[in-house]
Amino acid sequence: MAQLICEHLSLGYEGSEILHDLNFSVDAGDYLCIVGENGSGKSTLMKAILGLLPPLAGKVRTGDGLKRNEIGYLPQQTIVQRDFPASVREIVLSGCQGRCGLRPFYNRAEKALADRNIERMGLSDLQKRCYRDLSGGQQQRVLLARALCATQKLLLLDEPVSGLDPVVTAEMYRLIESLNREGTTIVMISHDIDAAVRYASHVLHIGKTVFFGTKAAYRQSAPYRRFFEGGDAA
């Protein structure tokens, strides 16, 4: 059953349309990779899914019992984020804020959840370290642990391996794949077409031609062929 549905979705800014009449759905347990040309609207779509940008037309809705506050988000890293002066545990625990309601403090269950996700991401030895002193790959694992404190159901990942070296990139992809195998639905923006067809179950290609379907069907599609013939820059 679909957890996320986009119906006849058109997006843009100040009346200027970037995406037109987009239709796709994400079922529980899917691993959807969103690829496309630079400026094609991938990050704009992510904003709409998060409810940060109202559609020009159409709608984004959730299903299968998924609530809006059960969508975890790993944004692209910025310089300000990389230099954030807080401990690893403090940052991971902040992912539980949506669970607190009006309470000013985290309860025992929320602290235990943060500790489990710290261990899950292999960060137990780093939890007292300052976030800004970590490597790029370690920082991404911290932010992923934080997102998992918000939800175990659906994660939105915006370029999660951007700026990472090849070894750490491969490690990050394996980690995301492991989360998906354990039941977390993944929606990931990526410039890496190879990773999309290696790890994802489904691909959404946004550009002059829009494709949505399984990765097997994507390998036979015109957008995929154009990319490898050098026609598109994803």
What do the PLM-derived regions correspond to, one by one?
Residues 58-69:
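Conserved ABC transporter NBD signature motif
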Residues 108-126:
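Conserved ABC ATPase "signature" region
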Residues 130-134, 138:
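Conserved ABC ATPase signature
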Residues 155-158:
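Catalytic Walker B motif of ABC-type/P-loop ATPase nucleotide-binding domains
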Residues 166-168:
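Helix N-cap at the start of a conserved alpha-helix in ABC-type nucleotide-binding domains
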Residues 190-191:
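H-loop/switch region of ABC-family ATPase nucleotide-binding domains
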Residues 203-216:
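H-loop (His-switch) and adjacent beta-strand-loop-beta switch element
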